[in-house]
Amino acid sequence: MNKTNPERKISLTSFKERMACKEKPRDLQVLLIISIVLSCSFAVSATVEEANALLKWKSTFTNQTSSSKLSSWVNPNTSSFCTSWYGVACSLGSIIRLNLTNTGIEGTFEDFPFSSLPNLTFVDLSMNRFSGTISPLWGRFSKLEYFDLSINQLVGEIPPELGDLSNLDTLHLVENKLNGSIPSEIGRLTKVTEIAIYDNLLTGPIPSSFGNLTKLVNLYLFINSLSGSIPSEIGNLPNLRELCLDRNNLTGKIPSSFGNLKNVTLLNMFENQLSGEIPPEIGNMTALDTLSLHTNKLTGPIPSTLGNIKTLAVLHLYLNQLNGSIPPELGEMESMIDLEISENKLTGPVPDSFGKLTALEWLFLRDNQLSGPIPPGIANSTELTVLQLDTNNFTGFLPDTICRGGKLENLTLDDNHFEGPVPKSLRDCKSLIRVRFKGNSFSGDISEAFGVYPTLNFIDLSNNNFHGQLSANWEQSQKLVAFILSNNSITGAIPPEIWNMTQLSQLDLSSNRITGELPESISNINRISKLQLNGNRLSGKIPSGIRLLTNLEYLDLSSNRFSSEIPPTLNNLPRLYYMNLSRNDLDQTIPEGLTKLSQLQMLDLSYNQLDGEISSQFRSLQNLERLDLSHNNLSGQIPPSFKDMLALTHVDVSHNNLQGPIPDNAAFRNAPPDAFEGNKDLCGSVNTTQGLKPCSITSSKKSHKDRNLIIYILVPIIGAIIILSVCAGIFICFRKRTKQIEEHTDSESGGETLSIFSFDGKVRYQEIIKATGEFDPKYLIGTGGHGKVYKAKLPNAIMAVKKLNETTDSSISNPSTKQEFLNEIRALTEIRHRNVVKLFGFCSHRRNTFLVYEYMERGSLRKVLENDDEAKKLDWGKRINVVKGVAHALSYMHHDRSPAIVHRDISSGNILLGEDYEAKISDFGTAKLLKPDSSNWSAVAGTYGYVAPELAYAMKVTEKCDVYSFGVLTLEVIKGEHPGDLVSTLSSSPPDATLSLKSISDHRLPEPTPEIKEEVLEILKVALLCLHSDPQARPTMLSISTAFS
């Protein structure tokens, strides 16, 4: 019998216990491995689920192809997609980053997997074409730190739920179409350091809750329509560095609490409606680099405390109502580079302390009431590039060292009381590009006062006291395009070298004492568009070489001593719209060639010795508005064909030997009596108001036999007339009652016929109604922003008739707006430019209201570009001319009209092309006359895709709105289609940004020749400057037009 050994049993038990203790760690390891494997499996499953959710969202995009950046978004079977999918990053088994910026996506957020991506910390969907609204579900991503939906097409309001993003550091919603107010809940984002929601359509106030964002470093709210006052709480943000509230509708005062913002380097609040004084506490912002408060309604003095800001490099206070003197303390801003305080009401002298601004590059003091001499120290800065002092009351001499650094480019001194000689440093200042001395008392010998300027583009020395002869050295200023020396005391002959300045676009030597003859070599300046030599002592023949100046638009040779005939070859000036040869000794007949100047709008040949008859071919001058043939020896009749000259508004034929009836034309009917005096045999109708004798239809001598014959004929006729008169009387009595009823009905319905025409409006009204078949759709040729355009073939001309729509019609029927509208129409009918569609008049009747324009054969530029065959005919040369023509017209509207006219709707649909593809601006339905004493704030107008940001959002009308639209139009002409999103990209690019012409040019055209290509590239550079988001940084149309000339 076996008995168990107790000791053995104990030892066996001890062994098992020991073994069990050794196996416990191994079991834990196994459990841990199993746990890790399971968790990884779950993580892969979770990550794949998130990826599938993104794939489902991608499937809703409307434009994804195999070549798109998202073509890598396939097969999420494993977590490897985290490294292979474009724009996706993962951590700890979950997607945390989604960066799809600039991937060309077209879609919405309706199907975004909000509930499937709980760990997102970074979302960048900017620079795409997302549309629709921002979902409030974005507020669920509590871990989100970076959120960017900028540069899309999002609409609607900013959801208040975004205030729940408690970890958010950066919020960017830039350049969308978001509207409504900024939700106050944004003030709960206590960790946010940057908020950028500029360039939207936001309204309402800036929330005072922004004062809670104590970590905020940068706040960008510019280019919206925000209103109300600026919350003083913003002044309590200790970490704020950049604050941009510009281009809104903010009102009220600048908070004095801004003095607490010790770290702010950039403060932009320009182009608002801020009022009151600039708080002196701004001087406590000692870190400021840029302070821009221009274009507001600020009053009071410039605070002297600004001098405390030693770091300030840019100070823009222009276009306000600041008064008082310039504080000397501004001279203590030793870092100042750009100081602009123009267009205020500042008085007193320029402080001597400005001599301490040794880093100054730009100084703008123009359009104030400043006085006294310019302190010599103003020229101490060797970096001085732009100095604008015009339109003040400055006196004395210019500082001798005004071009000390040799970098001065722009010097504007117009309309002051400067005197004395031109400083030697200016004579030797090779850097000059633009110089204006107009309207002062500068003196000295013109031949010695100026040197050679290799970069000079424009110089105006008019209305001064310069004397002496012109120097031949001007020929060496080879970039000079505008040379204006009128109203001085210049003598001698014009040097022959002047006629070698082939780059000249404008030459004005008028009102001097210049003598000699004009040579045939005048034909060398074949780029000239404006030639003014009037008011001198020039003699001899008018050179026939003028016929070669085919770019000439304006010619004034009046008040000289030219003799002999008018050159018959002057008919070869296709662009000429103004010709004045009056007050000379010209003789012989008026050459037939003048009647071929189809663009001519003003012709003055008065006070000469011209004889012969007036040609009936004058009727060819359908654009002629003013004609003066007075004080000559003209004879014969005024041709009856003058009745067909529909544009004619002013005529003077006095003091000639003319006879016979005056033509049946409104210009003749409305002319004053002195327009016909001195012509003893001129006669008019019985109802004439010009004091002319009635025209007789019988001769003064008749034989007795003839008289008897007449009696035999007249007696029965008179009898018949009496009988007919009785019948007519009965009929008239019957009609009188009917007419009274009709007139009563008309008066009740406001049925007036109101017209502004350069011809008989009532007659034309009936003709137009008939020609358009009472506006039958078969005559419809286009639709504009304010009505439909019809083709009307009248007896003597084809016209375009724009019938205003009911909305526009009802608005102008309001008595409070009618007169303003009619005043604008009158102003527009006076526009005289070859690149502006002529507006003949306006007619308002209870049934129809319409505008009458000249007819353009090829229709709109947009239609031409949309048609492949037509677009190919519009070759590079023609496209260049289109751009230049529009530029010249806008320059005329902005700078040659008083008040200036802003079109506000420059687009390819409003550029019409004639038979020869010459471009003309049309549709002034939204035009605004910039009257100096009126507000320039107006409702939004214009065509989508062409509207300047400040007009679309801030509704501020300036000429720079047209400049922006011109930039878009120029790109469209080059590209052959609207540039679309390229515009917004270029608007935010630096002004010197370059583009590959090949990448954006119209591929329907062959590649341009090297010469043409260079010109197109120059035009492209101008377009980029026009698209600058800051209106003040855009060029003027005058500078563009001059450059194109």
Curated annotation (Swiss-Prot):
TM annotation in the entry: 710-730
Residues annotated as binding ATP: I781, G782, T783, G784, G785, H786, G787, K788, V789, K802
Stored SUPFAM superfamilies: L domain-like, Protein kinase-like (PK-like), RNI-like
Cytoplasmic side: 731-1045
Phosphothreonine modification, residue list: T772
Single Gene Ontology MF annotation: ATP binding
Location relative to the cell: Cell membrane
Gene3D superfamilies in alphabetical order: Phosphorylase Kinase, domain 1 (3.30.200.20), Ribonuclease Inhibitor (3.80.10.10), Transferase(Phosphotransferase) domain 1 (1.10.510.10)
Residues with Phosphoserine modification: S938
Keywords from the UniProt entry: ATP-binding, Cell membrane, Glycoprotein, Jasmonic acid signaling pathway, Kinase, Leucine-rich repeat, Membrane, Nucleotide-binding, Phosphoprotein, Plant defense, Receptor, Repeat, Serine/threonine-protein kinase, Signal, Transferase, Transmembrane, Transmembrane helix
Any GO BP annotation: defense response to insect
GO cellular component term of the entry, any: pollen tube
Segments forming domain Protein kinase: 775-1045
Effects seen without this gene: Defect in apoplastic reactive oxygen species (ROS) production upon stimulation with some immune elicitors such as flg22 and AtPep1, and in response to SCOOP10 and SCOOP12. Insensitivity to SCOOP peptides including SCOOP4, SCOOP6, SCOOP8, SCOOP10, SCOOP12, SCOOP13, SCOOP14, SCOOP15, SCOOP20 and SCOOP23 leading to the loss of modified gene expression of several genes. Altered activation of MAPK (e.g. MPK3, MPK4 and MPK6) and root meristems distortion triggered by SCOOP10 and SCOOP12.
LRR repeats: 92-116, 117-140, 141-165, 166-189, 191-212, 213-237, 238-260, 262-285, 286-309, 311-333, 334-356, 357-381, 383-405, 406-429, 431-452, 453-476, 477-501, 502-525, 527-549, 550-573, 575-597, 598-620, 621-644, 646-670
Swiss-Prot/TrEMBL catalytic activity: L-seryl-[protein] + ATP = O-phospho-L-seryl-[protein] + ADP + H(+); L-threonyl-[protein] + ATP = O-phospho-L-threonyl-[protein] + ADP + H(+)
Protein's membrane topology: Single-pass type I membrane protein
Main localization, broad class: membrane
Segments in the Extracellular topological domain: 44-709
Chain positions with Phosphotyrosine modification: Y853, Y892, Y946, Y953
First and last residue of the signal peptide: 1-43
Annotated glycan sites: 63, 77, 99, 119, 179, 212, 249, 263, 284, 323, 380, 393, 410, 487, 500, 580, 633, 687
Biological role stated in the UniProt entry: Acts as a receptor of SCOOP peptides from Brassicaceae plants regulating multiple processing including plant growth, development and stress responses. Perception of SCOOP peptides induces the association of MIK2 with the coreceptors BAK1/SERK3 and SERK4 and relays the signaling through the activation of receptor-like cytosolic kinases (RLCKs) BIK1 and PBL1. Also able to detect SCOOP-like proteins (SCOOPL) present in fungal Fusarium spp.
Similarity section: Belongs to the protein kinase superfamily. Ser/Thr protein kinase family.
PANTHER family, per database record: LEUCINE RICH REPEAT KINASE 2, MDIS1-INTERACTING RECEPTOR LIKE KINASE 2-LIKE ISOFORM X1
Identification of the protein by name: MDIS1-interacting receptor like kinase 2
